Structure formats: structure tokens, C-alpha cells
Regions:
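Functionally important transmembrane alpha-helices
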Residues: 169-221
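Function-critical hydrophobic alpha-helical transmembrane segments in multi-pass membrane proteins
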Residues: 127-187
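N-terminal, membrane-interfacial amphipathic/helix-forming hydrophobic leader that caps
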Residues: 1-94, 102, 108-121, 213
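Hydrophobic alpha-helical transmembrane segments
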Residues: 15-20, 56, 94-98, 139-143, ...
Length: 221
């Protein structure tokens, strides 16, 4: 993806801006979920026992924060929505998409095998406390990931953060830096449920690796 013709920034400033964007997305999410807590206060005390509707609303609103943060950045920097890449991939692009999907599947299978073989501890994500053992919520979460999670994260971390890093880095370096930022913002959500540092690092490594794959896919398509 090509970026608009703007001057190249220094790597430090560009990285700080990218980190700020990610942090802004997380901060915005803390406010966008507030209506869900008003709808069902049980979300704050016993998340797994809250109503199905309120849990669904909360998880959807959480990702809305990323979209709002990205939109504010685009407006504040006069980049506008034309800065966002929204188009169907070319025939070659679809091949990259298929390769990315296959690559991510193989990556997660290999990581799972390594974790199981070495008996490595791995913390649950904070989202798990809203799902609990509710199989219906598991199915709903799959839909949320597909329709809200993935689009929101791709919008903020690929279309904006990663592209912003192009101003100071080559494509590959930008992908690595964006993936590192993406992994870092997930630390707290895993650390809250981890029994050890290793239990936090294992899923964070998985997040980083998966982000590398999708970052490369975005850069190629």
C-alpha cells in the first residue's frame, strides 16, 4: 500500500506517534464500553454471569474505540478517509490472502504443538472472563471477531499505525515495529490472568507472530 506524499519523519518520532496511536485506541475503548456497564452493572462484578446481550454489546463497543481513535487521528492530521485503503485485492493479492490465511493457520498449529510439547504455561486473555463456559457466547465471539475485531484492528494497526511507520522505515521494519506495538498493548490483558512472567510471554509471542503475518499480508496487498 502506498502512503500519501509526505515528508519522511525520523524513526524515533514516528515510533512514538505510532505508540501514541495504539495507546489512544486503548484509551478510547475504555470509554466506548461504558454504556454496556450501565446496561448491566454485573459486567463489573461478575462478567460471566452478566446477560448475553450486555456481554455482546461490551465486546463490540470495545473495538469501536479503535475506529474512533483512528478517525480522530485522520481528521486531526488532515489525512482524511482517503488515507484508508479500502479495495478488493487483485488476483495476485488474493493469492497473498490465501497464503496469509494458510501461514497463520500453520503458525498457530506449530505454536500449539510447541506449547503442549514443552508444557509451557499460557495465560488466558481478559476476554475469557466475559465468555466463561458459555458455548453460545463462544459462537457469538467468533462473529464479533470476524465482523468487528478484525476490521477494527486492521483499520487502526495496519491502515494507520503501520502506514504511519512507513514515513521512517522500510516496509519490513514497519511491519515488525507495528507488530511489536500490537503485542505490547496486549500485555496487560494477559498479565492479569498469568501466574508467571512466562505465562504472559507465551501468548504475547503468539500475538506478535500472528501480527507479523497479517502485517506482511497487508504490505503485500
Amino acid at each position: 500500500m502506498e502512503t500519501p506524499p509526505r515528508h519522511r519523519d525520523g524513526p524515533v518520532r514516528t515510533t512514538l506517534v505510532a505508540i501514541g496511536l495504539a495507546a489512544f485506541g486503548i484509551l478510547a475503548s475504555q470509554f466506548t464500553v461504558l454504556p454496556a456497564f450501565v446496561l448491566d452493572p454485573a459486567l463489573a462484578t461478575a462478567p460471566a454471569d452478566a446477560s448475553l446481550v450486555s456481554r455482546t454489546v461490551l465486546l463490540i463497543l470495545n473495538f469501536l474505540g479503535f475506529v474512533i481513535a483512528g478517525g480522530i487521528y485522520l481528521a486531526g492530521t488532515d489525512r482524511g478517509w482517503s488515507y484508508v485503503d479500502v479495495r478488493l485485492p487483485s488476483k495476485r493479492g488474493w493469492l497473498y490472502v490465501l497464503a496469509g490465511i494458510l501461514g497463520s493457520f500453520v503458525f498457530y498449529v506449530l505454536v500449539t504443538l510447541i506449547v503442549q510439547t514443552l508444557a509451557l504455561p499460557s495465560a488466558e486473555n481478559q476476554v475469557s472472563m466475559y465468555i466463561g463456559n458459555d458455548q453460545t457466547m463462544v459462537l457469538i465471539m467468533i462473529g464479533i471477531v470476524f465482523f468487528f475485531n478484525a476490521p477494527a484492528e486492521e483499520f487502526l494497526f495496519r491502515n494507520i499505525v503501520q502506514k504511519r511507520l512507513y514515513a521512517a522505515f522500510d516496509r519490513l521494519t514497519a511491519v515488525v515495529v507495528a507488530s511489536a506495538i500490537f503485542a505490547l498493548i496486549h500485555i496487560l490483558s494477559y498479565a492479569l490472568f498469568a501466574d508467571s512472567l512466562l505465562a504472559t510471554l507465551v501468548p504475547i509471542t503468539v500475538v506478535f507472530g500472528g501480527s507479523i503475518i497479517f502485517g506482511l499480508l497487508y504490505a503485500k496487498t
